[in-house]
Each structure stands twice: as structure tokens, then as C-alpha cells.
Amino acid sequence: IPGGLSPRDVTDPDVQEAAAFAVEKYNAGSKNDYYFKERRVVEAQSQVVSGVKYYLMMELLKTTCKKTVGRPKGYQEIQNCNLPPENQQEEITCRFEVWSRPWLPSTSLTK
């Protein structure tokens, strides 16, 4: 549907790339002392708008990896972080909008 929202498979490589970008940007902007990693993409939609806008609902888990000033971790490093014991785990559900314009190349987290 041109201009409309279309459901996307959460395992689609483009969706996974947008999710990884969202996790990195979330952690960069979060005031939490610890990194949150992707548990799963719950739902994904896309919209063609001068590029592609991905609308993602994701579950994130707080890790035991402490943030270091001036040395942000990338997505793969964050995903390799350990989790605290189950009774101490913190899970959050986030909605992200990722706007991808590969010809620029430009990707941004708009929400």
C-alpha cells in the first residue's frame, strides 16, 4: 500500500537492521547506567515515505554491562552482555520509529 502501513515479518533482515539501530540509539540516549538489549521484536510495520519508516514494538532487557563514558557499545556487543539473575531482571516494552533513507545514506530514530 503506497504511503500506508504494511505489516512486516519480525525476522525480515531490514526489520532486524532497523531494530539493531533502535537498540543502539535507545542506549545512547538513555540515562540508565546499564545497557538494555533486544529480547525480541514483538511487531513490525513499514511505510514508504521518501525512504522507509519502520514502526517497531520491541521488548528490551536490562543487562549487567555498565556504560563507559566515551566508549559506547555497538549492537552485537550489547547483545552479548549478560543478564542479571531472573528475579532481578528488568524488561521494558518500547515503540520505535526508524526512518531509513539508504541513498543518502541516512537512518534516524524519529521516535
UniProtKB/Swiss-Prot annotation:
The organism of origin for this protein: Bitis arietans
This protein's record includes keyword Disulfide bond: yes
PROSITE patterns reported for this sequence: CYSTATIN
Family: Belongs to the cystatin family.
Feature type site, description Reactive site: G3
Keyword Secreted assigned: yes
Motif (Secondary area of contact): 47-51
UniProt cross-references to SUPFAM superfamilies, sorted A to Z: Cystatin/monellin
Annotated localization: Secreted
UniProt-recorded name of the protein: Cystatin
